[in-house]
Design a protein with these regions (language model features):
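Short His-Asn-centered micro-motif
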Residues: 56-57, 165
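Gly/Ser/Thr-rich loops at beta-strand to alpha-helix junctions
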Residues: 59-62
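A glycine- and small-aliphatic-rich helix-loop capping segment at beta-alpha/alpha-beta transitions
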Residues: 69-74, 144
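HTH-adjacent hinge/linker in prokaryotic transcriptional regulators
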Residues: 1-54, 66-71, 88-92
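Conserved phosphate- and dinucleotide-binding cores of soluble alpha/beta proteins
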Residues: 82-209
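Short beta-strand element of Class I
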Residues: 74-77, 95
Length: 209
């Protein structure tokens, strides 16, 4: 319907394409909310006062921000509209939104050049979302346009936290972020399967669940 095709993001109406294999933020935001919140709470506890944190796009990320103590001062770096709106709610957060071309399906701003704002930043910690995690294929997502900023964070942040609910286990999506060994922590809502437990032990990845 026309109503479904015109979601409201941050007070603005945007037209978005729809296909069975394409990630749409508006479709995902009501799925597995309790599970996402549980994983997010584990991850939020890793942030320390006065740190700079990178926050990925996706529907789990705002729950990480929601779980951060309102008394904690920090700097939040983001490139998606829904993440920026969540950061605005934290009274002691200095929010940095990286601008660029807007993509409505996942509400991200893709920088026209990574040499703009991002080249001046070196986050203490980075929080990532993914649509799939697999022991062989690593962390993957739906949209190729997310990869430049995700890869920037993976190369420039000092500590890396992958935050996923259990529905992402064993899934492989088209856009590859990287090996699971690139992450220091994987936070989820339930205990991962034995294969992932074994990989985490081998690669010294901390698991939070």
């Amino acid at each position: 319907s026309l109503h479904d095709a015109l979601p409201i993001l941050g007070g603005y109406i945007v037209l978005e394409p729809r296909s069975a294999t394409h990630y749409l933020l508006s479709d995902q935001k009501t799925r597995l909310v309790d599970e996402k919140r549980r994983a997010a709470r584990h991850a939020a506890g890793l942030l320390e006062a006065h740190q700079m944190a990178f926050f990925d796009c996706g529907t789990t990320t705002p729950w990480i921000i929601d779980a951060i103590d309102n008394e904690l001062p920090f700097t939040g770096v983001c490139y998606s509209l829904n993440t920026f709106l969540a950061l605005q709610e934290k009274p002691l957060c200095r929010a940095i939104l990286c601008g660029g071309e807007f993509h409505a399906s996942n509400a991200i701003f893709l920088p026209l050049s990574l040499q703009d704002t991002l080249s001046h930043l070196s986050p203490d910690i980075a929080y990532y979302s993914a649509a799939g995690i697999d022991c062989e294929q690593g962390a993957t997502c739906y949209n190729l346009e997310e990869l430049p900023v995700k890869h920037w964070a993976m190369n420039n942040a000092r500590y890396h936290v992958l935050v996923v609910d259990h529905s992402k286990f064993g899934k492989v999506r088209p856009a590859r972020m990287g090996e699971l060994s690139r992450f220091d922590v994987i936070a989820s809502d339930v205990r991962p399967d034995d294969d992932l437990l074994a990989l985490a032990k081998e690669k010294q990845i901390s698991l939070l669940y």
